[in-house]
């Protein structure tokens, strides 16, 4: 069923939702899929609309739906408060005083936290992202390739200036 968790990363409370299938057995390691929402979304909304909690239920997968940070950004000369993943340096023009959050650190912390609560299959940790979440997933394919087996991105991309030097080569 649905679980809401929070963790503290660099002094900020960060939120994520986890669907634990009814068939979960703590004696059997369970595969993990991160689902990263797009711009203006959040973990709860993606939990409700992505269809992955249902897939996780039928396929016995622990599905994770983290929420990105709400930033003040300047886009096309307009200031707006909107959720975005900090997918690569220089991706957005932040308002004065806004501090980009370390989302890779956040996603790693989720794995650590959940590893203390559940029996995770460390060889089957995957990440799926849509739009800005897809951009974040591609960043993680480089910076988290030591803990992620594969990444799927939809409607996202690598930054043009991304240095692709992954810790391990994984399918993207």
Where do the PLM segments sit?
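Serine-hydrolase catalytic-loop signature spanning alpha/beta hydrolases and amidase-signature enzymes
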Residues: 40-42
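A fold-wide structural signal in alpha/beta-hydrolase
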Residues: 60-67
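Cap/lid segment of the alpha/beta-hydrolase catalytic domain
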Residues: 67-102
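Catalytic His-Asp charge-relay segment
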Residues: 169-172
């Amino acid at each position: 069923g649905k679980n809401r968790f929070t963790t503290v990363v660099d002094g900020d409370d960060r939120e994520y939702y986890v669907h634990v299938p009814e068939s979960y057995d703590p004696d059997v390691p369970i595969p993990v899929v991160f689902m990263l929402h797009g711009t203006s979304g959040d973990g709860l909304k993606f939990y409700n609309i992505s269809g992955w909690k249902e897939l996780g239920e039928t396929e016995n997968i622990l599905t994770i739906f983290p929420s990105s940070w709400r930033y003040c950004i300047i886009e096309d000369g307009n200031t707006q408060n909107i959720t975005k993943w900090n997918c690569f340096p220089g991706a957005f023009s932040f308002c004065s005083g806004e501090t980009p959050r370390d989302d890779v650190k956040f996603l790693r912390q989720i794995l650590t936290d959940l590893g203390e609560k559940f029996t995770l299959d460390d060889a089957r940790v995957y990440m799926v992202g849509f739009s800005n979440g897809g951009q974040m997933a591609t960043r993680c394919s480089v910076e988290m390739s030591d803990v992620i087996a594969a990444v799927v991105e939809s409607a996202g991309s690598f930054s043009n200036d991304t240095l692709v030097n992954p810790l391990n080569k994984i399918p993207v």
